[in-house]
Amino acid sequence: MELNRRDFMKANAAAAAALAAGITLPVKNVYANDNSIKWDKAPCRFCGTGCSVLVGTQNGRMVASQGDPDAEVNRGLNCIKGYFLPKIIYGKDRLTSPMLRMKDGKYDKNGEFTPVSWDQAFTIMAEKFKKAIKEQGPNGVGMFTSGQSTIFEGVAKSKLFKAGLRSNNIDPNARHCMASAAVAFMRTFGMDEPMGCYDDIEKADAFVLWGSNMAEMHPILWSRISDRRLSKQDAKVAVLSTFEHRSFELADLPIVFKPQGDLAIMNYIANYLIQNNAIDQDFIQKHTKFKRGETDIGYGLRDNHPLEQAAKNAKTAGKMHDSSFEEFKQLVSEYTLDKAHELSGVPKDQLESLAKMYADPNLNIVSFWTMGFNQHVRGVWANHLIYNIHLLTGKISKPGCGPFSLTGQPSACGTAREVGTFIHRLPADLVVTNPEHVKTAEKLWKLPNGVIQTKVGLHAVAQDRALKDGKLNAYWVMCNNNMQCGPNINQERMPGWRDERNFIVVSDPYPTVSALSADLILPTAMWVEKEGAYGNAERRTQFWFQQVKAPGEAKSDLWQLVEFSKYFTTDEMWPAEVLAANPEYKGKTLFDVLYRNGQVDKFQVPADKAGYINDEADHFGFYLQKGLFEEYAEFGRGHGHDLASFETYHKARGLRWPVVDGKETLWRYREGYDPYVQAGEGVSFYGNKDKRAVILAVPYEPPAEAPDAEYDLWLSTGRVLEHWHSGSMTRRVPELHRSFPNNLVWMHPTDAQKRGLRHGDKVKVISRRGEMISHLDTRGRNKVPEGLIYTTFFDAGQLANKLTLDATDPISKETDFKKCAVKVVKA
């Protein structure tokens, strides 16, 4: 076999990734040149980077994968998880039939899981949903969904709940990872999602990572940063975190700060910029406006919690007051070098070096962040503060310069945010609380006025509380494992799931912790077992075709949503006055009015594509995915969210919106790059009516919980390279499981010695909410400072979220998984 340069580079990259994880990589995943294998493209199933892979199928099975050499994102490379993608769908315990808890031939909350037909499953499910709506109103039902759902599934579920069932109680697990970023985008720019793109990496002179371990969580992007750092003279990398991780290995400026200290650091930088005349006055005057945020806003805990009782402005947490540059200058002036050092624990010379990087007018700089910023009781503020720095310097919306929020899931942007599967959102940045936005949605969905409620539903943590309190009685969990991944399992989630008043449905391909805690399990098709679309962190929309069939009776989430709609009629779900005013809708099923409405069902599948598979089209009789997409795309066309045609995406390796006249947009808000910026404007933040971005003055405030005499350590949670989220897919890949089989607790050697502990010891981690048994690591990849431990949540045998606190950012309602107090003893 002849090996060309591209193959050589791919093989070496694959081998390097495997070596980092301690894995032997199958040769077929590197070269995959078997001519009997059929290849087609698909975006990776894992993180928000949006790598494209080539999927190899043979005899109806996925047998190989390789990085897509024609993809701009990853350029033929995959991370170690990507190289083992074929194995995620072939776990020995795949679910192949609906499973209902039964006893003596009928449903019983305490019964054993028993196989049932889809009709039996949907019949009992519809009965429970109708009962909950009759007793509680539309708010008695809810859905917790996902940033891993396809765009088509997102549209279908949003329509089913918000229009069909008239419940805005639908929220994605992106609430736990991207809500703070999304809210801050909207508050600052009037539009969601980053203004830049991955091309910034090759054009930047410096990179600053805030609470982001890109080396393990976004490894392909990290490989591009590494290449830039090593190939460009004087390129710099700064990494900020509460502990040292693998990204520190490349850092020129490695900074470890005290939990919550990032707020003080960023306010110090803003102060430094002003005091040293390193701000762009012209840019500020033309393109920004100043606001002051509400303070003392609480921590998103239950209303009767002492911290909420003491907070002065918990009810108005999101309020912003008109302000001025002088008032902003006065607030940040308090954040001197001494104060920033005191609050953050960072050496003064490091703080000054970081500030000078942002102050250098000749330095193109990109700020990246992920969960360290977002999973934060002041996550919205943290996002605002980094925008402040880029807006003050004018280092934004141009090649190699800008703030860049990275996503953790493959379609947290494309589905959760762009489609709008949050409790308050509709497609293309529309919101349910705006009556005009609601009218637009009803018109585009061909629905009568008055169907969609204008009140925000229950967010993720509030759903847990409502289930526990008996106010939410029918609940559908789709494409996530929230029993394992959500906070405060013991006190706030498990009680509601096992409450006799409630009926819990979980759609999943595997018997996860969530599935086994449910009353009804629906077996789900995975990834290329269905046709789909994702939207990644750089606004890139990517499509793929179905390539294999799901096993047994497993069905896609899209099929489940649309088929379930047949079990309800408008007479049962919609107000009598709406039907009286619109008699043509009376007596129809929700399937008729939502999906067979004359526009979703008007397309047929391509007749000229050999070997084409589409299980949904075969079942429903029309090209469901195309119909849903074209209906959805109308929301954004002409409004700065333009998408290309359906067929275009199947041909391309993704396009970055807005796509106008067939051309994608790399940098938004900048003349010459963004078609919505008019000639002569230079920069236009057109999401806001006045076309100005907000610079927000907010202070440092402490976390919800901190170590004390009894619980004397900080706990931070996160992930490792080898596993993704709850491990329900990656732990079923033998090679990945062997490389990192179980969760660990990383502790500083001095802290271990003080407690009479040693590396490898079995330990018990205890918080005010629960406890977890694990093993101690004082030598591994993560180097934690004294006073803090780090652990992960991929291990179903060690439920780390029994420890975490359900405190949230009061504005975004996103959970802080990075800061709570624990103690550690020998087990």
Swiss-Prot record:
Its EC number is 1.9.6.1. It comes from the Bacteria. This is Periplasmic nitrate reductase. Predicted to be exported by the Tat system. The position of the signal peptide cleavage has not been experimentally proven. GO terms for molecular function: 4 iron, 4 sulfur cluster binding; electron transfer activity; iron ion binding; molybdenum ion binding; molybdopterin cofactor binding; nitrate reductase (cytochrome) activity. The lineage of its organism: Bacteria, Pseudomonadati, Pseudomonadota, Gammaproteobacteria, Pasteurellales. It comes from Glaesserella parasuis serovar 5 (strain SH0165). Residues 37-93 form the 4Fe-4S Mo/W bis-MGD-type domain. The keyword Electron transport applies. Component of the periplasmic nitrate reductase NapAB complex composed of NapA and NapB. [4Fe-4S] cluster binds at residues 44, 47, 51, 79. Keywords: 4Fe-4S, Electron transport, Iron, Iron-sulfur, Metal-binding, Molybdenum, Nitrate assimilation, Oxidoreductase, Periplasm, Signal, Transport. It catalyses: 2 Fe(II)-[cytochrome] + nitrate + 2 H(+) = 2 Fe(III)-[cytochrome] + nitrite + H2O. Its main location: periplasm. It is found in: Periplasm. Binds 1 [4Fe-4S] cluster. NCBIfam families: NAPA, PRK13532.1, TAT_signal_seq. Pfam families: Molybdop_Fe4S4 (PF04879), Molybdopterin (PF00384), Molydop_binding (PF01568), TAT_signal (PF10518). SMART domains: Molybdop_Fe4S4. The keyword DNA-binding does not apply. Belongs to the prokaryotic molybdopterin-containing oxidoreductase family. NasA/NapA/NarB subfamily. The gene is napA. SUPFAM superfamilies: ADC-like (SSF50692), Formate dehydrogenase/DMSO reductase, domains 1-3 (SSF53706). Mo-bis(molybdopterin guanine dinucleotide) binds at residues 81, 148, 173, 177, 210-217, 241-245, 371, 375, 481, 507-508, 530, 557, 717-726, 801, 818. Catalytic subunit of the periplasmic nitrate reductase complex NapAB. Receives electrons from NapB and catalyzes the reduction of nitrate to nitrite. GO terms for biological process: cellular respiration; Mo-molybdopterin cofactor biosynthetic process; nitrate assimilation. Substrate binds at residue 793. Residues 1-32 form the signal peptide. Its cofactor is [4Fe-4S] cluster; Mo-bis(molybdopterin guanine dinucleotide).
